[in-house]
């Protein structure tokens, strides 16, 4: 199984390091980078074994049809959501991560039923 991100997700994660540092969620830029690196590593390593749900319409309208999402808790207050598409090519299963966000931004669009 192969997990990869589209360029827009890579750019978002790079920008996230700066945002986390500048908004003082982390005192050091290196610590913010480590947090983002660990988040991405968690997604790449564990996405294939996570429970998946169909993505709400809000996300499929913006990031593509046929999306699913999986939840990646980071601490008591923050959960990250990876929105992805799955496809097979040459018998190999691929996971294309098309968007990443967290509950602080997207909670109103996620159905927790």
What function would you assign to each model-found segment?
Residues 4, 35, 68-69, 83-84:
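Aromatic side chains
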Residues 72-113:
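Enriched for short, Lys/Arg-rich terminal
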Residues 25, 55-58, 85, 113:
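Charged, low-complexity, helix/coiled-coil-prone segments
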Residues 44-75:
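A short, surface-exposed loop/turn module that caps and links secondary-structure elements
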Residues 39, 46-47, 84:
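Conserved short aromatic-hydrophobic micro-motifs
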């Amino acid at each position: 199984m192969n997990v990869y991100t589209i360029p827009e997700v890579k750019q978002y994660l790079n920008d996230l390091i700066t945002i986390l540092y500048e908004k003082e969620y982390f005192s050091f830029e290196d610590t913010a980078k480590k947090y983002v690196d660990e988040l991405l590593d968690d997604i790449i390593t564990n996405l294939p074994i996570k429970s998946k749900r169909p993505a709400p319409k809000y996300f499929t309208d913006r990031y593509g049809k046929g999306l699913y999402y999986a939840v990646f808790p980071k601490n008591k207050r923050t959960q990250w959501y990876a929105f992805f598409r799955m496809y097979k090519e040459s018998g190999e299963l691929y996971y294309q991560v098309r968007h990443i966000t967290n509950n602080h931004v997207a909670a109103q669009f996620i159905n927790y039923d």
